[in-house]
Amino acid sequence: MTNKNAYAQSGVDVEAGYEVVERIKKHVARTERAGVMGALGGFGGMFDLSKTGVKEPVLISGTDGVGTKLMLAIKYDKHDTIGQDCVAMCVNDIIAAGAEPLYFLDYVATGKNEPAKLEQVVAGVAEGCVQAGAALIGGETAEMPGMYGEDDYDLAGFAVGVAEKSQIIDGSKVVEGDVLLGLASSGLHSNGYSLVRRVFADYTGEEVLPELEGKKLKEVLLEPTRIYVKAVLPLIKEELVNGIAHITGGGFIENVPRMFADDLAAEIDESKVPVLPIFKALEKYGQIKHEEMFEIFNMGVGLMLAVSPENVERVKELLDEAVYEIGRIVKKENESVIIK
């Protein structure tokens, strides 16, 4: 018996691994940008920082996964957008610190290497990288029979970006009186899915609920996370933004205070929040307390900006999309987030 056959008998298909690498090369090629060095398949991805033109570069990194949204991708056998979710969760975090994404690495672990399915996953990662302007310079596909079921896989990513030292966004510039601007989310993004799956546990996904405006439930649940990089980078370059909050797990309550000092608070006008239909459906069918919704979900706002009043119109002009004035920064009395 050869070593190859012995490994195959243990459940690891080396040939399938080689096939995945060949399948994903064309997707990775879409993401190439200035600064990328070397070819796919090396022991480490390389990037030439001098190509960015940044005078005082500060590297900013982020890592994340997509949580149990993956379980719905597996359930509905739809794998071509979950990679975008993974990229979005990482790059939206680093853009909140003022970083331009440079490169991305992914990690996929599975019980059985199915090249066609994994190609779809990585194609989604590549699409996310294109939207973020980041190069996919490396990754790992691990086949682990016994650790995962044959149909199961997990996905994680790691993003690295760069910022001018003078343009880092760390919350220190946010002051009382700043206007809070909300940028629309595409849906649930990639948070709260353990609760979402419980609420819709008895649904097939084919249902068209009256609240969802003609869309199938599974389409809404797997809507890919919006990537805000190209919208927000011009604002950072012009130094128009004092603070940025990526609204992820923990909703408004946990994430908004991360962009300002402890002596400040965010006062939110709930009537200005563009609540999406899926959140109304979740509140109704899950019998979730209304105030708790803001502690879990983005409620239709995926990114929040703190902007000086005199810069609001210029920010709106550059964004060229619906921008929601949802509140302001005030002196903290009790709570860090006040929703009225």
From Swiss-Prot:
It comes from Streptococcus pneumoniae (strain Taiwan19F-14). Its EC number is 6.3.3.1. GO terms for biological process: 'de novo' IMP biosynthetic process; adenine biosynthetic process. Keywords: ATP-binding, Cytoplasm, Ligase, Nucleotide-binding, Purine biosynthesis. Pathway: Purine metabolism; IMP biosynthesis via de novo pathway; 5-amino-1-(5-phospho-D-ribosyl)imidazole from N(2)-formyl-N(1)-(5-phospho-D-ribosyl)glycinamide: step 2/2. The keyword ATP-binding applies. It is found in: Cytoplasm. GO terms for cellular component: cytosol. It catalyses: 2-formamido-N(1)-(5-O-phospho-beta-D-ribosyl)acetamidine + ATP = 5-amino-1-(5-phospho-beta-D-ribosyl)imidazole + ADP + phosphate + H(+). This is Phosphoribosylformylglycinamidine cyclo-ligase. It holds the Pfam family AIRS. InterPro entries: PurM-like_C_dom (IPR010918), PurM-like_C_sf (IPR036676), PurM-like_N (IPR016188), PurM-like_N_sf (IPR036921), PurM_cligase (IPR004733). HAMAP family: AIRS. The gene is purM.
